[in-house]
Amino acid sequence: MAPDEGDQAMSLQEEKPAYPSLSTTSSAELLHGAPLNDNERLDILQTAEHAMHRGSPKVDPHIWTNVTSHFSDSSTIDGRQRDILFERLTVRGKGSPFQIQQTILSALLYPLAYPIKRLVKLVGKKESHDGPGTILRGLNGIVCSGELLLVLGRPGSGCSTFLKSLCGYLEGLDVDTASEIQYKGVPFTTMMEKYRGDVVYNQEANHHFPNLTVGQTLEFAAHARAPHNRAGNQRGDQCQWRGKKESQVSLALFSLGGERTEGKAMRTDTVGMNSIAETVLSRASIVAWDNSTRGLDAATAVDFVRALRTSAKLSGSCHALAVYQASETLYNTFDQLILLYEGREIYFGSRERAVPYFESMGWKRPPQQVSADFLTAITNPGERQPQVGMEHAVPRTSLEFEAYWKSSPEHAELQRSMQQYKQKTPLDISEEIKLDEVKRLEQSTHARPSSPYLLSVPMQIRLCIVRAWQRTRNDIPGLVSSAVAQIVVSLIIGSLFYNIPQTTAGLGQRGSVLFLAVLTNALISLLEINTLYSQRLIVEKQAAYAFVRPFTEAIAGVIVDFPVKLFRCALSAIIIYFLANLRREASHFFIYILFQLTAVMTMATMFRTLATVTRTIGQAMSLAGVIIICVAVYTGFTVPQFDMPPWFAWIRWVNPIFYAFEAIVANEFHGRHFECVEYIPSLSFQEGLSFTCSYVGSVPGERYVSGDAYIAGSYDYSYDHVWRNYGILVAFLVFFYVLYFWLTELIPGTTPTHEVLIFRRGDAHPKLSRSDLESGEQPRPLQELKSLAPPAHPSMAEQKDTLSWNGVCYDIPVKGGEKRLLDDVSGWVKPGSLTALMGVSGAGKTTLMNVLARRMTIGVVTGDMLVNGHEPDASFSRKTGYVQQQDLHVETCTIREALRFSAALRQPQSVSTEEKYKFVEEVIQLLGMEDFAEAVIGNPGDGLNTEQRKLLSIGVELAANPQLLIFLDEPTSGLDSRSSWAICKFMRKLADNGQPVLATIHQPSAVLFEQFDRLLFLAKGGKTVYFGDVGHQARTVLEYLEKNGARQCGPTENPAEYMLEVIGGGTQGQSTPIDWVHAWKNSSENTQVLEELDSLVSSPSNAIPADPCKLSEFAMPLAVQFHHVMKRDLQQYYRQPEYILAKFGAGIFCGLFIGFSFWSSDNSSQGFQNVLFSLFLLCTIFSTLVNQIMPKFLSRRALYELRERPAKTYSWTVFILCQILVELPWQTLLGICTWASFYFSVYGDDQSPQRQVLILLFTVQFFLFASTFAQFVIAAVPNLVLGSMMATFTFLLCLLFNGIMQPPSALPRFWIFMNRVSPLTYYVGGISATALHGRPIHCSNRELRVFDPPQGQTCGQYLAEYLKTAQGTLHNPLSSDRCQYCPLRVADQYLAARDISWHDRWRNFGVFSVYIIFNIIGAIGLYYLVRVLPYAMKNRTQKSPT
């Protein structure tokens, strides 16, 4: 708790009298005793808070729920109690039952195929359905307040859809019009519109702001839903104080700390508990929990459900939970139960009567099978077992089960109960009035009565402002890095135009520096898109919870960002303004800042609006690229208004930067006279009107140029437009604000995704075409008994190796010292044994597995880890299989391709490809994946579902045919009990075939636990509690615990839950009088373990083979690795048309837009300048290309470094080379397409083929440089934000110093070297010299310098001496007045001023090629130095002698 928060809390506590402590109050007293008053409950909160600050783990969840539920008078609670009645609930899904994988060819043919497809639909037979079909079919039931409903069913049966439907989360779903859902007399639509916060859905995915601590996250939730006008007329600050206390006790209840909510920085169980606590603090009357116990150990899951049970009884709330793995203890906590089978209801009623109902139907419950598993097994034809003699009497299909249910007495009783309930609580206004009264008591004073939110809009905005400020304050590194980047860019721009002279020599430089200042400040706002997309899911969730409206978060973001933007703008303005020597007048300086700030705010809001209306960040970035080009071209600087093509000239009127730039330029030049430094003619005798200044806006006979005349002649700007433009700019700002706020409320934040299987064209399995799906989920694997048949694997490698570890410790550096995660852990895994690794949450199970697999990249590992008594050799990693918790795969591959890739590169070279692929087919059959082996993996939420991904992860490791050991980290996490059982049986089969297996597991049932031979049990801190045999019915481990003082395990208890309980597991970490770590160290069992370890070392077996191929780090040579990896990468690109088409769309559009904007530039000086600026603008596509390439590289790098490199699948050189080379063909083709789209429109078709080909080569070079540069930058950096910042900064340097914006001769001496090292200098120089060499210049009327000759002389006579050395031409030598002089004769003179020469074109081509080669070498070198060498050194030094 922050100091200011603590002071506030103490001051509030001092106002209250001291009450007797109620910390000893029992749960029974709370449930059945006299009700507590508010003062007593406040005392409980304070006691719980003090216990939390003292580090006490004992915060009773029952006490906590009593206080949070009863912090008001009973009438308020009675009014908030809601029941749920659903009748004839039928829900259909949107979308296709399965999809066909798109490729580049199919995407290109789509415009032709779509009309044909529509025509066939019109004239052909109408399809039976347009979506994946009916998910839920006629469900009926009622859940009363105070009850818990357990939702059971196999994945794909409709459990998630059922929960979503109850809570009104209907994105992607259609509810049948005959369906009825009511909440104690309140209709469904009314409940969703007016009382949405009382009905919430806790989804399995967790989304939180990464820059908030857990405490801040929960405090926001508590404040958003804390009642603000309770009985007793308590003040608003006391309500806020209560919200703070509730959030603090939530931290203690769910064992959460002050760490950030970012998922990567926290364990899975911690993130899940954070979401659970947030949902509890929503104070909803009805909550649906979708597999929310995933990732929690058994004891913690039970504690969580018990807390919900207490909350339901005390507050009258009701909860529906879908649980895939429910222990008997957890099962007995529920009141009601619904069982779904293929979307049909086959039972609804009392939990106690569910098992007897199905037993009376004729089904047999196996011994030791928990009730939930038995009920779920009923819906699986391959698992359920009929009683003897009932084989032909029991129902078989879901239709038969539904018919049996509807004809049963239990269903008739349910119908009677529902009819009685509807008569008692009809759909009338009375219940709505009662609920309105309760809501008004809880709402703030100024909240709209019909609003589902408790806070008024101003209070929501204030709350969001506090949170936005917390996020900003917690992101100090981000703020500092962005400020440093802004300072550096400003310093570069300011020093590039350092001390611009107050003469005509600085006129062009002033325009350039103002253009760059406006453009860079405005385009930094592009990052707003990333910010908005990162918080979109969070804002959508909290709007569904009725915390705050989406537009209030948008307003808060704008308000909190304003001082940051003001600071950045002011900082940038001060640096650029004074370094460049712009107008030194206070009024003009502040006008400059005003327009800069307004332009930045306008562009930021424009990009936020763009992010709101798009569905993916790729779409937003593509459209943003279009906006950037339009903004840059049509400001009036690169293309003056009088040269704008009529078909695009209108763009400037809708371009906010056009108005800002005109005003800033006019502000700088208005009312100023710039002394001329170059005259025409430059003769010693000049008098009258016989000379003029050689700059736009000059007047014959005047020795200065008026600033107003200059901007009028150069840009067609006027000072009269300054404040008109500001009004228009503010109008743009207001318009985008209103549009942005409105769209955040109107448009949903996300498009629902469905786990629909994706197949390559022609590969869809026929069995899947008529599947009954939930959100596109396909029939589950492992559902037939044949999948459990004993496997026959003649090709399985013979296992003879033993992995042992002794005294393993692991320390990591933390602030202020080191933290020990593993402490003196010993054990072994022998061939043919299945070992379980268990422990409380955070005990170090995954850490130990990573240490044993030699996958740790930080910290110090000590102790012995040996294979057959020897140090592991270089082949150790590839000989082990490691199934991680994260299912990481290449999303475009099919299952069969992924398995073949693993087999081809990880099985020994001595095994032929045919044998490897044959083995893959055996793995597919063993895992029961035949029906979807050709399915594309896809991304999470779109493609394989959770179970299929887990099976694939196991299959990938099994396909490698590991010769040593298989590690499985939480292989059953997120799976239903049937799938978990099947996977454990599969591990058992592997062990029976001689394969040593080590697996972590956190929620095993008693039957599942018996599959393991040995157990390694860890306590908090990575300390050993037990290592040894499990025994029949776990008697060996139970006897050990009981003889050391644990209570006796009951005959129906789950041994896994029992063990967690007796050592102090669960959310509260219940204290135990027994020091189990000390007991183990002094036990005879530990002595036996150490003796066995000594024997394994003293009598090593299986000496290391001499064959060097068997000891090599990789199974296959580099050439074979390169072949398979390159083939996969090429396939990936071909199967991602959205990536390739976005790349080509950006390039072709950019080329066409620039081409038509600079259409057929004439031979005037302005025309040649337009040609150069067209190259400058074409370079802006560089940033878009780089930002497309880098995320793709990072995703592939993550897969390689997290899974494929530790497994020694292939070498790092193969990885980096393939990543570089796979881009080059597409970049080459993109360069050709871009050249064709802009070359002829800008340069015409009258140039020689040699010049056309050379410009084509330069264009292709540019795109090759862009891809290799992106990989050079991102190869070593840790994340996309840093990579994008570095790439943008480097590109900006190259762009600024390429000679277009500032000629080399005008650069400050310090920056001259940058012109020479900028790759774009050679690109621009090569193309412009090739395109413009030898072209004559014909000045336009605006560019001609007009003056009168002395009386009695013609223009030719007057300028005869001057023309001998001048570069220009005289148009009318015989005229005696108005001499017309063009300052330049040929384009080469124009280019020479920028140090560009025709003779250097091939040199430029060669130098630019060298930069491409440098990028490739640099990417390889940096990746090795930063990502490979430290990893290799860590692996070499990870093992230390004991």
From Swiss-Prot:
Membrane topology designation: Multi-pass membrane protein
Transmembrane spans: 476-496, 513-533, 558-578, 587-607, 620-640, 727-747, 1139-1159, 1171-1191, 1212-1232, 1254-1274, 1280-1300, 1405-1425
| Entry keyword annotation includes Membrane | yes
Query: Which keywords does UniProt give here?
Result: ATP-binding, Membrane, Nucleotide-binding, Repeat, Transmembrane, Transmembrane helix, Transport
Q: Which residues bind ATP?
A: 839-846
Q: What GO molecular functions are on record for this protein?
A: ABC-type transporter activity; ATP binding; ATP hydrolysis activity
Gene3D superfamilies the record matches: P-loop containing nucleotide triphosphate hydrolases
Q: Where is this region: Disordered?
A: 1-24, 768-797
Q: Say where the protein is mainly found.
A: membrane
Q: Which residues form the ABC transporter domain?
A: 120-367, 803-1045
Concerning InterPro entries, the annotation shows: AAA+_ATPase, ABC2_TM, ABC_transporter-like_ATP-bd, ABCG_dom, ABCG_PDR_2, P-loop_NTPase, PDR_CDR_ABC
Record localization: Membrane
Q: Does the keyword Transmembrane apply?
A: yes
One GO cellular component from the entry?
Answer: membrane
- Any Pfam family matching the protein: ABC2_membrane
Q: Which CDD domains match?
A: ABCG_PDR_domain2
What is this protein's function?
ABC-type transporter; part of the gene cluster that mediates the biosynthesis of the meroterpenoid compound andrastin A, a promising antitumoral compound. Is required for the production of andrastin A but does not have a significant role in its secretion.
Q: Which family does it belong to?
A: Belongs to the ABC transporter superfamily. ABCG family. PDR (TC 3.A.1.205) subfamily.
What is the protein's given name? ABC-type transporter adrC
Q: Which gene encodes it?
A: adrC
